[in-house]
Design a protein with these regions (language model features):
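Short, structured segments at the rim of ligand-binding sites
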Residues: 1-275
C-alpha cells in the first residue's frame, strides 16, 4: 500500500462513531428510567453492543442497532439470571456488574481473558457493602490469563435496607464511581452517598455521568470527596429522542492531521464537555 502526503491543505467533513463513554451511560440511565428513549442513528462499537446485550439479558426492552436504538418503555421483564458476554469492554463489565447488584437474580459476566484481568475489586467491595454478593469464578488454567473465568453477582434483595453511604477507592478507575452513581438513586428514597478514599482518576468521566443522570431527573452532586445521588429516575411523559454524541477519541488522528497540515476538518456534534 502506498500513502501519498498531502500536497496542500484540504477540507473535509465527516461523521464520527458514537462516544462509547456517553452511550453506555445513556443506555443504562434510559433503561432504569422506564421511559421510552430513542437514540438517533450513530456508528456503534463492540462496547455499546455489549451494554445492549446486557440490558436485554436483564429483561429491559432494548432493540435496534446502527439505524437507531430504542429503550423502554416500562419496567423490565422478570428474569432470574443470565450469563452475559462483555467481550473486551471494561466499561460494560463494570457498569453491568453494578446493575446486576441492583436486580434480584444470579448473574454471570464473562469476557476475554484480558478483560477479566482488569481492576475490579474496589467496585466489588462497594457492591458487597450495598448488599450484593460478588465473587470471582476461577478458571481452569494456570496461566495468569486463565485464572479468572467470570464474575458472579447475586443481586441484593429489594426488601433489604441499603446503607446510606459507601466508601470507594477510585484512583484506579473513575468507572467504579460512575457505576455506583448510575444505580445509587434506585437504592431507595434517600439515594446514595459515595465517599472517595484517595484521589479520583479521570474525574471528567464521573462528571459526564452526573450530567447524564440529571437529564433523567436524578440529582447528582459532588462536594469534595463526597458524591451523592438523590431522587429516583422519573419516566418522561413523552418519548425522549437523544442524539448520541460523537467520539472525541476517534477525532484524535484527524485533529493531528489538521494541525500538521493546516487542513480544515470538521466533525459535527462534538461537545467540548465530552472531550
Amino acid at each position: 500500500m502506498q500513502i501519498l502526503p498531502l500536497l496542500a491543505p484540504a477540507e473535509a467533513r465527516f461523521e464520527l462513531p458514537a462516544s462509547k463513554s456517553a452511550a453506555n451511560r445513556l443506555l443504562i440511565a434510559a433503561a432504569l428510567s422506564g421511559a421510552r428513549v430513542e437514540f438517533e442513528p450513530a456508528g456503534l462499537n463492540a462496547d455499546i453492543e455489549a451494554v445492549q446485550r446486557g440490558l436485554a439479558a436483564f429483561g429491559f426492552r432494548v432493540e435496534g442497532g446502527t439505524g437507531g436504538i430504542r429503550v423502554g418503555p416500562g419496567p423490565r421483564a422478570a428474569t432470574a439470571g443470565a450469563r452475559i458476554d462483555c467481550g473486551e469492554a471494561g466499561t460494560a463489565l463494570r457498569f453491568l456488574a453494578a446493575l446486576a447488584a441492583l436486580l434480584p437474580g444470579e448473574w454471570e459476566l464473562h469476557g476475554s481473558a484480558r478483560l477479566l484481568q482488569r481492576p475490579f475489586e474496589p467496585l466489588a467491595d462497594a457492591l458487597r457493602a450495598l448488599g450484593a454478593e460478588v465473587r470471582v469464578v476461577p478458571g481452569e488454567g494456570s496461566a495468569p490469563s486463565d485464572r479468572i473465568s467470570s464474575l458472579w453477582v447475586r443481586g441484593r434483595s429489594p426488601q433489604a435496607p441499603a446503607p446510606r453511604r459507601v466508601a470507594l477507592e477510585a484512583q484506579l478507575s473513575s468507572q467504579f464511581l460512575s457505576a455506583l452513581l448510575l444505580i445509587g438513586a434506585e437504592l431507595g428514597p434517600a439515594g446514595l452517598e459515595i465517599e472517595l478514599r484517595g484521589p479520583l482518576a479521570s474525574g471528567d468521566y464521573a462528571r459526564l455521568t452526573a450530567r447524564i443522570l440529571e437529564r433523567f431527573g436524578v440529582e447528582a452532586r459532588a462536594e469534595g470527596p463526597l458524591w451523592s445521588v438523590r431522587r429516583r429516575f422519573r419516566p418522561a411523559p413523552e418519548p425522549m429522542r437523544i442524539a448520541l454524541p460523537p467520539d472525541w477519541g476517534a477525532f484524535g488522528v484527524w485533529a493531528c492531521l489538521q494541525h500538521a497540515s493546516g487542513s480544515r476538518i470538521e466533525a459535527p456534534g462534538l461537545d467540548p464537555q465530552d472531550g
